[in-house]
Amino acid sequence: MSAYAREMRVLCISGKRFAGKDTLARLLVEAAGRQGITLSTYAFAGESKRMFAAARPEVELARLLDDRAYKETWRPQLTAFTVESLAADPLVFVRAVMRRIQAPALITDLRLRHELAHLCTVCEPQVVRITRNDEHRAASGWAFDPTKDTHHTETELDDPSLWNEVVHNDGSEAALAVHADALLSRWLARSDAPRSDR
């Protein structure tokens, strides 16, 4: 476990598909940067790609992370690797992320109760739930899919008692940026929050 764990809180973003998780993460990183703090981002889903690439030397990790067409060529093998890895250890990617955390951290894709339960044993996660109404989600490309939208990865963290903060994303990106700044300021006001790198 990294020295970072237990000493500081980790921000974790939870939310439905097309709620704006990645956008909020980017805005939080930008807000932290303006205050001289490097906020590193981690994703459990991304960790499966890292581990897959480590096991397959012919796979280019950078392209797997950022090149959609390239990722599609490897999707069947990546999916099989992910399923097999999770069957062997449901926390394999969570543990891998926590071993790498060495700085103020933002987890961008908290989805499952057992992920949160594990985080609570090794650090102090602060769960930020981002919400967005269906009209705005649809404007970004969301369409209800009963298979995806009722899957446990979309619903396990619907209980508000699991959230520390709620960010409503029903306006512009500029409005969301204001929420991100306020959220970061509240986090930094805590005695155990990270301080400026400057």
Task: Please tell me what each predicted stretch does.
Residues K21:
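Conserved lysine of the Walker
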Residues L91-V92, I130-R198:
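Small-molecule kinase domains that catalyze NTP-dependent phosphoryl transfer to phosphate-bearing small molecules
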